[in-house]
Amino acid sequence: MTIIDHEMLWRQFGAVIDMLGDALRDCPEELWEKRLWEDQSDQWVAAGFSAFWYLGYHTLFWLDLYLTGAEEGFAPPAPFDLVEMEPGEVMPRTYSREELLRYLEYCRRKCQETIGTLSHEQAYRLCRFAWGELPFAELQLYNLRHVQEHGAQLLMFLGQQAGKDASWVSQAQ
């Protein structure tokens, strides 16, 4: 029995990607490199992880990787770097708004295609990561939640720091 079909999943996944895009587009230049929170002494990610631009990149990077379903053989498109694969890494150079918006469009298309062509066999393919393993379809629900979490953090930051109102996207087109 099918409970959620491809179109339902895409409309909601696309909506969270669109809201992330709103945050990236609406960020004033003076906040692009500002941190949402202070670094922690025991964090395993690079110092500066919570910079607005980097949190956007982090979200897109993992969206792309999780749509692939495996770390092995994954590489983000140029000019982006592999990140967060090893403790103690350094931050990549600051990516521009335009670069991140192009990556967002790339990920949006990849997500729509991945969901639209997802077969029963692909949905149940087991995906393994350092933090655990789960079927590919469940990984996409995890992925959606991850994009929503960071998109909401960025939008809340813009509301607090720049008085920007977030527009709710109920469904992607």
Question: What role is predicted for each listed range?
Answer:
Residues 28, 71-76, 114-123:
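Proline-centered turn/helix-capping motifs that create local helix->coil transitions or kinks
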Residues 13, 17-20, 24, 104, ...:
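Hydrophobic alpha-helical core bundles mediating ligand binding, dimerization, or RNAP-core interactions
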Residues 10-14, 18-21, 33-86, 128-173:
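Short, contiguous alpha-helical
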Residues 1-7, 173:
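Basic/polar N-terminal segments that are highly enriched at the extreme N-terminus
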Residues 87-127, 135-150:
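Acidic/histidine-rich alpha-helical segments that form the ligand environment
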